[in-house]
Amino acid sequence: MSRVAKAPIEIPAGVEVTLNGQEVTIKGAQGSLSRVVNDAVELVKDESELRTNAREGVANSTAQAGTARALLQNMVVGVTKGFERKLQLIGVGYRAQAQGKKLNLTLGFSHPVEFEIPEGITIDTPTQTEVVVKGADKQLVGQVAANIRAYRKPEPYKGKGVRYADEQVRRKEAKKK
């Protein structure tokens, strides 16, 4: 039995939740997010909370209700506070510069890498070796950060590459003669 689904989602002041069948739209200070919830989940909205209930007689509906509750909670947090993911560029000559809707990356290739910033995401570069990805959609923020990291993953011998700020890179010892 999913314990996650039993906890209600608190709707803070300034957040508007709209239910249209199985589609949930949440609006807040950081923007608006929308998601279609699985048919195995029943949504109940009170004045200041949202509940996800498992439908009776549907296989794995409790698991689906727990998943839906976690996703909706992330949407509420996203439209109120937002999410961010920090990346570091480690290596000689590795640089990042945000220009409008593009992120220019110099990662040791023979050409600069231009990364197109998707809608709903803002990218800051506090220094030339730091990239901060911000947005309301947790999944999109993580995906954009993973796409940037994929251009040059940290290598295990010197640790050069693009890494998350909280990532520990396992180092290998060089081959001995």
Swiss-Prot record:
The keyword rRNA-binding applies. Keywords: Ribonucleoprotein, Ribosomal protein, RNA-binding, rRNA-binding. It comes from the Bacteria. The keyword Metal-binding does not apply. One of its GO terms (molecular function) is rRNA binding. PROSITE patterns: RIBOSOMAL_L6_1. InterPro entries: Ribosomal_uL6-like, Ribosomal_uL6-like_a/b-dom_sf, Ribosomal_uL6_a/b-dom, Ribosomal_uL6_bac-type, Ribosomal_uL6_CS. GO terms for biological process: cytoplasmic translation. GO terms for cellular component: cytosolic large ribosomal subunit. This protein binds to the 23S rRNA, and is important in its secondary structure. It is located near the subunit interface in the base of the L7/L12 stalk, and near the tRNA binding site of the peptidyltransferase center. Belongs to the universal ribosomal protein uL6 family. Part of the 50S ribosomal subunit. This is Large ribosomal subunit protein uL6. It comes from Idiomarina loihiensis (strain ATCC BAA-735 / DSM 15497 / L2-TR).
